[in-house]
Every structure is written in structure tokens, then in C-alpha cells.
Regions:
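Extended two-metal-dependent nuclease catalytic cores across DNA- and RNA-processing enzymes
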Residues: 2-176
Length: 176
């Protein structure tokens, strides 16, 4: 967290308390992890859960009962777009949970997730569409059952640890 924001946290918490808004935090976890835990808990209780977030990483939480509302500004007007399981599947051709796998390969500089050098968003999506997960991708490579070639294969093989670390870093915890 940037120092400027950290300095403001006590004031923000005071304002939230004054508005009778609950504050939930847990040492060692990010807000996304708490959000993921609460969303999945609500879903298990039979609730329809809506998350309003500008962070597309939350798409991995989308399901038939969890909707992610993403604000976007178009022609000076802010609107929200809803993403549930069906919308993620339609837009990415992947199940929401597979977006973690995509991030493991492509990385995300804004979240300090390294990914695999040379793998961009389109390649990451197509690899996960074909191999379903990072684990399965590497299993196919080890069994020589993949169709990767050249520099791409070299990068993926050489950066297995980085891909696995990136997957861990990109996954929102749901049991905090």
C-alpha cells in the first residue's frame, strides 16, 4: 500500500465507523481475499451476491449466484456492466476460475505478478482454452503431448516456477 494511502487509513476507518459501515480486515490478507471469502460464504447461504469493483481480477469469483459489476465511463457517463459466469464464458471463452490460469501465464504488472515472458493476453487465453490450466499445460509438456514450438515453448518450460508463483499470487483466497 502506498504511504500516502496508509496515512489516510485511520481517517477512512473513522468516517466508515461514523456511517455505521462495518470494517472487516485480517492481517496478512488483501481486501480481495476478504471479499472473495464473504462472496463465497454468501453464495453458500443461498444468497445472490453482487460485487461492485473496478478490479477485473474479481471476475474469477463470478458464478451463477455471484455477479461482478464493473463501472466504466463512456462518453462522459459512468455505467456498470454485469459479469456473472455466463458473461465471463461469453467474453473470454473460459470459466471464471480459469482467469487465474490466464493471469499466471500473462502476468499483471499492476499487481506485481510476473507471468511467463513473451506470453501476452491472447496467447494466455488460447493456451488455457486448449490445456485448461497451468498444471495441465506443464503435464502435457512433460509427457511430450503438447504442440508448442520454438521460443514460446522454451519460455514456458524455462519459467515453470514463475508461472506457478504467478498463479498463487493471482488467486483470490476464498477461505480467510
Amino acid at each position: 500500500m502506498p504511504d500516502e494511502l496508509a496515512e489516510q487509513m485511520p481517517v477512512i476507518k473513522d468516517v466508515l465507523r461514523a456511517m455505521n459501515i462495518d470494517i472487516i480486515e485480517k492481517e496478512g490478507y488483501e481486501g480481495d481475499d476478504i471479499l472473495g471469502t464473504l462472496a463465497k460464504y454468501g453464495e453458500k447461504q443461498g444468497l445472490e451476491v453482487t460485487i461492485l469493483s473496478g478490479d477485473r481480477d474479481t471476475f474469477q469469483l463470478a458464478s451463477d449466484n455471484i455477479t461482478i459489476r464493473i463501472p466504466r465511463t463512456k462518453a462522459g457517463k459512468t455505467e456498470t456492466e454485469n459479469y456473472n459466469r455466463a458473461k465471463v464464458l461469453e467474453e473470454y471463452g473460459l470459466e471464471p476460475v480459469q482467469l487465474i490460469e490466464v493471469k499466471a501465464l500473462q502476468g499483471d504488472t499492476s499487481d506485481n505478478i510476473p507471468g511467463v515472458p513473451g506470453i501476452g493476453p491472447k496467447t494466455a487465453v488460447s493456451l488455457i482454452q486448449k490445456y485448461h490450466s497451468v498444471k495441465e499445460l506443464y503435464e502435457k509438456i512433460e509427457k511430450d503431448e503438447d504442440d508448442l514450438k520454438g521460443k514460446q515453448k522454451e519460455n514456458i518450460v524455462a519459467n515453470k516456477d514463475m508461472a506457478e508463483l504467478s498463479r498463487t499470487l493471482g488467486e483470490i483466497h476464498k477461505n480467510v
